[in-house]
Regions:
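Ser/Thr-rich, low-complexity intrinsically disordered terminal regions
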Residues: 1-129
Length: 129
């Protein structure tokens, strides 16, 4: 399990397709960060609310600029590590990786894209944009 910040960056993905990351990474593993305009503290709070509304989660670690969430699959009980990094710029960097196996059939990417959409909809709806 390679989680946490190292020199202000999320860990790169291993050479398996079951991981995506917004900082660095090759094309296969890249996902865009979430951009927002507004207060960082409000973005941190909203990401927390969004992920807490999803099934099978456990907050594993949290600081003022980092959130590590474990997602447990319903059927097999596999754990995926999902991380959010809130640097001082108005972006949220993300990483999602399966702990075991090779392919995830795009599950990690789909999860982060779902979180992105939910965040952006609520950010706009709540008048933070």
């Amino acid at each position: 399990m390679d989680t946490g910040l190292k020199d202000g960056r999320l860990a790169p993905c291993p050479n398996r397709p079951n991981c995506v990351v917004s900082q660095g990474g090759d094309k296969r593993h890249h996902i865009d960060p979430i951009a927002y305009e507004g207060e960082k503290s409000a973005a941190v709070e909203l990401i927390q609310q969004v992920v807490q509304g999803l099934a099978g989660i456990r907050i594993a670690a949290q600081t003022e600029d980092y959130l590590h969430v474990e997602f447990r699959s319903k059927m097999m009980g596999f754990v995926d590590d999902v991380e959010f990094f809130f640097p001082d710029s108005a972006v949220i960097h993300m990483r999602s990786a399966s702990r075991v196996g090779y392919s995830d059939f795009g599950a990690n990417r789909k999860r982060l894209e779902k979180i992105r959409v939910m965040f952006q909809q609520r950010w706009t709806r709540d008048g933070k944009a």
